[in-house]
Protein backbone atom coordinates (compact mmCIF):
# COMPACT_ATOMS: atom_id res chain seq x y z
CA UNK A 1 0.00 0.00 0.00
CA UNK A 2 1.00 3.64 -0.40
CA UNK A 3 0.72 6.34 2.25
CA UNK A 4 2.28 8.55 4.87
CA UNK A 5 4.39 6.82 7.51
CA UNK A 6 3.05 7.23 11.05
CA UNK A 7 5.02 7.23 14.28
CA UNK A 8 3.94 5.79 17.64
CA UNK A 9 2.45 9.19 18.50
CA UNK A 10 0.04 8.93 15.56
CA UNK A 11 1.76 11.75 13.67
CA UNK A 12 3.21 11.60 10.18
CA UNK A 13 6.99 11.24 9.96
CA UNK A 14 8.28 14.77 9.56
CA UNK A 15 11.04 15.35 7.03
CA UNK A 16 11.28 19.14 7.11
CA UNK A 17 14.77 19.19 8.64
CA UNK A 18 15.97 15.78 7.44
CA UNK A 19 18.46 14.95 4.67
CA UNK A 20 17.06 14.19 1.22
CA UNK A 21 17.41 10.41 1.53
CA UNK A 22 15.66 10.21 4.94
CA UNK A 23 12.19 9.23 3.67
CA UNK A 24 13.47 6.68 1.16
CA UNK A 25 15.50 5.07 3.98
CA UNK A 26 12.55 5.04 6.39
CA UNK A 27 10.27 3.58 3.72
CA UNK A 28 12.70 0.78 2.87
CA UNK A 29 13.08 0.06 6.61
CA UNK A 30 9.40 -0.98 6.66
CA UNK A 31 9.80 -2.93 3.38
CA UNK A 32 8.43 -0.18 1.15
CA UNK A 33 9.64 0.15 -2.42
CA UNK A 34 10.46 3.87 -2.35
CA UNK A 35 9.52 7.11 -0.67
CA UNK A 36 9.98 10.84 -0.72
CA UNK A 37 9.45 13.95 1.38
CA UNK A 38 6.07 15.34 0.28
CA UNK A 39 6.07 19.16 0.17
CA UNK A 40 9.02 19.13 2.61
CA UNK A 41 6.61 18.10 5.36
CA UNK A 42 6.01 14.34 5.66
CA UNK A 43 7.35 11.03 4.37
CA UNK A 44 5.20 9.35 1.71
CA UNK A 45 5.97 5.72 0.84
CA UNK A 46 5.10 3.36 -2.01
CA UNK A 47 4.41 -0.39 -2.08
CA UNK A 48 4.53 -1.04 1.66
CA UNK A 49 3.18 -4.24 3.22
CA UNK A 50 -0.37 -4.00 4.59
CA UNK A 51 0.83 -4.28 8.21
CA UNK A 52 2.57 -0.89 8.08
CA UNK A 53 0.61 1.86 9.84
CA UNK A 54 -0.17 4.81 7.60
CA UNK A 55 -1.82 8.14 8.29
CA UNK A 56 -5.50 8.55 7.58
CA UNK A 57 -7.69 11.59 8.17
CA UNK A 58 -10.40 9.36 9.67
CA UNK A 59 -8.07 7.76 12.24
CA UNK A 60 -5.79 10.74 12.85
CA UNK A 61 -4.79 10.98 16.51
CA UNK A 62 -1.75 13.22 16.16
CA UNK A 63 -1.66 15.83 18.92
CA UNK A 64 -4.59 14.25 20.77
CA UNK A 65 -2.61 12.41 23.43
CA UNK A 66 -2.80 8.63 23.63
Curated annotation (Swiss-Prot):
Single GO cellular component term: extracellular region
Disulfide bonds: 11-62, 15-37, 23-43, 27-45
GO biological process: defense response
One Pfam entry name: Toxin_3
Domain LCN-type CS-alpha/beta positions: 1-63
Domain of life of the native organism: Eukaryota
Gene Ontology molecular-function annotations: sodium channel inhibitor activity; toxin activity
Record localization: Secreted
Tissue specificity note: Expressed by the venom gland.
Cross-referenced CDD domains: neurotoxins_LC_scorpion (cd23106)
UniProt KW keywords: Amidation, Disulfide bond, Ion channel impairing toxin, Neurotoxin, Secreted, Toxin, Voltage-gated sodium channel impairing toxin
SUPFAM superfamilies linked: Scorpion toxin-like
Summary of the function given for this chain in its UniProt record: Beta toxins bind voltage-independently at site-4 of sodium channels (Nav) and shift the voltage of activation toward more negative potentials thereby affecting sodium channel activation and promoting spontaneous and repetitive firing.
Family under the similarity heading: Belongs to the long (4 C-C) scorpion toxin superfamily. Sodium channel inhibitor family. Beta subfamily.
Domain notes: Has the structural arrangement of an alpha-helix connected to antiparallel beta-sheets by disulfide bonds (CS-alpha/beta).
Name by which UniProt lists this protein: Toxin Tppa1
Amino acid sequence: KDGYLVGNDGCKYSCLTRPGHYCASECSRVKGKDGYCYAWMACYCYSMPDWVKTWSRSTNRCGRGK
